[in-house]
């Protein structure tokens, strides 16, 4: 039995669909049973300070923990209460219930851009200054301690920026902007990315013991290995022919306007667009290999193979 949290989120919903299609024994944990009629469901709220009910983890062979707060401007206390404390409570309950394997979906933002490897344990990196990344870093460290002296295996997965035919967050904003804007973005910034379908395949492989800690890989940097700058991303997301490439000065000015319209700190949009978050070629991972690239994400309604 696989226990999945965050089944209504961007990654969790796709993972749930894949597991159901494969007829894998599945239990969902969440705050609401809405749209969960076809699956076993147990009420669970990460913000509850009490220990999870025993029924949550009964007969579970693997926990895949996708739930959490990801909003950029959530409060520091919410990040701490849900992403760190809630995750640790669930992990301790899994250990107490004798669950063999715990898979934690973290974030590549845990890794500094100048790190030599993106697959070191969190303790080898400085704590990030950004609140969301810091909460993931803190959760990773706490989980490592939680699973240090017992038989439950821990797999930490750090995905790059996740995409699919259906986009979310900043990629969705960029796609909407490019529907009417006639120019590509300049070649600034670098990103590691991963198709949602590939991430789902990796999570399924981990749950089945074919990848992750069961094969000796406790921390996985999950990317397709490609280096995506803003120009490449904007070209891939464009559905109309562009006239050329936007000058950097114009792009910077547009970012200032966006900061003002959305109430962001001055310079936030430009920093997000121009910063480097590329972590090198895709690592060799047992039982999994990425198949998709951003440029062909809309072919047949989703990402296509390289």
Describe each region flagged by the PLM.
Residues 2-22:
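N-terminal Rossmann NAD(P)H-binding glycine-rich loop of SDR-like oxidoreductase domains
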Residues 44-85, 89, 93, 110:
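NAD(P)H-binding glycine-rich loop region in Rossmannoid oxidoreductase-like domains
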Residues 89-131:
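Conserved Rossmann-fold NAD(P)-dependent oxidoreductase catalytic core, especially the SDR/UDP-sugar
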Residues 127-155:
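Active-site Tyr-X1-5-Lys
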Residues 175-198, 202-206, 221:
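A conserved pocket-lining segment of Rossmann-fold NAD(P)-dependent short-chain dehydrogenase/reductase
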Residues 205, 209-265, 298-305:
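Mid/C-terminal beta-alpha module of Rossmann-like enzyme folds, strongest
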Residues 249-288:
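A hydrophobic C-terminal alpha-helical subdomain
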Residues 279-306:
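Amphipathic terminal alpha-helices
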């Amino acid at each position: 039995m696989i226990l999945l949290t965050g089944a209504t989120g961007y990654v969790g919903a796709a993972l749930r669909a894949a597991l159901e299609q494969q007829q894998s024994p599945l239990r969902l944990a969440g705050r609401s049973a809405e749209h969960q009629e076809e699956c076993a469901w147990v009420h669970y709220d990460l913000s509850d300070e009490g220990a999870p009910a025993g029924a949550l983890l009964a007969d579970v062979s693997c926990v895949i923990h996708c739930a959490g707060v990801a909003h950029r401007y959530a409060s520091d206390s919410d990040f701490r209460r849900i992403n760190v404390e809630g995750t640790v409570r669930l992990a301790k309950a899994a250990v107490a219930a004798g669950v063999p394997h715990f898979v934690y979906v973290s974030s590549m933002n845990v890794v500094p851009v100048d790190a030599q490897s993106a697959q070191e344990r969190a303790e080898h990196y400085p704590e990030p200054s950004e609140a969301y990344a810091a909460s993931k870093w803190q959760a990773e460290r706490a989980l490592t301690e939680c699973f240090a002296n017992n038989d439950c295996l821990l797999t930490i997965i750090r995905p790059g920026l996740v995409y699919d035919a259906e986009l979310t967050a900043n990629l969705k904003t960029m796609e909407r902007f490019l529907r009417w804007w006639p120019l590509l973005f300049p070649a600034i910034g670098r990103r590691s990315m991963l198709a949602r379908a590939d991430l789902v395949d990796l999570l399924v492989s981990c749950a089945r013991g074919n990848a992750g800690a069961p094969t000796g890989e406790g921390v996985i940097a999950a990317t397709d290995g490609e280096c995506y700058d803003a120009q490449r991303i904007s070209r891939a997301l464009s559905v109309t022919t562009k006239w050329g490439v936007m000058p950097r000065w114009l792009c910077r000015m547009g970012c200032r306007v966006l900061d003002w319209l959305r109430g962001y700190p001055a310079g936030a949009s430009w920093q997000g667009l121009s910063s480097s978050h590329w972590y090198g070629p895709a690592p060799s991972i047992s039982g999994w290999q990425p198949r998709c690239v951003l440029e062909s994400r809309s072919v047949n309604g989703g990402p296509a193979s390289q």
